[in-house]
């Protein structure tokens, strides 16, 4: 607050001075954890770019180098999860829910449940591609989920898997070969 939005690097320096001394013990050890400053700075940087764009009457896309495409496709992002909806339902469920509202409450712990989750998401939101967030179970089970998605949706539905950098190189090669022609990445 009170900083010049045109001085984004100065704002980053202020955040680094405040939060940049975190050690891994302060943020967790998993590879996808990021330092607090990354999360705080990214939101402030976007706000600054929005302010700058409004001041000079240009869209943020122009500040980032210009428009490259007219649309950005979104992917259904599947997670393994236990029963319970989260959000306003906390860990409870609504037995009267249907469609996506019911699916988001259901467990998704095996290939059949992952397919069910994907069908509900794609039906409710029109997704044209699917990504499974893996690194939760043994790789074989996660690959089986991808194969089940491929069987359920067919070859025209782009599929992706993200094992959260938890598969070894050898595991990635082994299962990557098995999924060749089925997944985008």
Regions found by a protein language model. Name each.
Residues 70-185:
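Metal-dependent enolase-superfamily TIM-barrel catalytic cores that perform enediolate-based chemistry
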Residues 4-7, 59, 106, 138:
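Alpha-helix capping and helix-coil boundary motifs
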Residues 15-19, 67, 179:
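Alpha-helix boundary/capping residues
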Residues 1-55:
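Metal- or metallocofactor-binding catalytic centers and their adjacent structured scaffolds
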Residues 39, 46-92:
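Glycine-rich, aromatic-flanked loop segments that form ligand/cofactor-binding clefts
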Residues 11, 40, 44-48, 56, ...:
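Generic hydrophobic, aliphatic-rich segments that mediate packing or membrane embedding
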Residues 33, 37, 41-45, 53-56, ...:
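Short capping loops/turns at secondary-structure boundaries
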Residues 6-9, 60-63, 133:
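Flexible, glycine/charged-enriched surface loops at secondary-structure junctions
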């Amino acid at each position: 607050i009170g900083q010049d939005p045109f001085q984004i690097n100065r704002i980053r320096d202020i955040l680094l001075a405040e939060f940049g001394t975190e050690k891994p013990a302060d943020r967790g050890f998993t590879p996808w954890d990021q330092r607090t400053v990354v999360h705080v700075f990214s939101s402030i940087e976007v706000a600054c770019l929005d302010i700058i764009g409004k001041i000079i009457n240009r869209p943020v896309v122009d500040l980032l180098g210009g428009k490259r495409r007219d649309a950005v496709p979104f992917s259904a992002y599947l997670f393994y999860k236990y029963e319970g909806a989260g959000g306003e339902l906390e860990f409870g469920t609504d037995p009267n829910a249907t469609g996506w509202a019911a699916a988001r409450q259901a467990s998704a712990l095996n290939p059949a449940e992952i397919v069910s989750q994907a069908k509900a998401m794609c039906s409710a939101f029109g997704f044209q591609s699917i990504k499974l967030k893996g690194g939760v179970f043994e790789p074989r089970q996660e690959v089986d989920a991808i194969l089940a998605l491929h069987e359920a949706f067919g070859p025209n539905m782009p599929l992706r898997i993200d094992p959260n950098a938890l598969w070894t190189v050898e595991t990635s090669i082994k299962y990557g070969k098995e999924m060749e022609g089925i997944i985008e990445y």
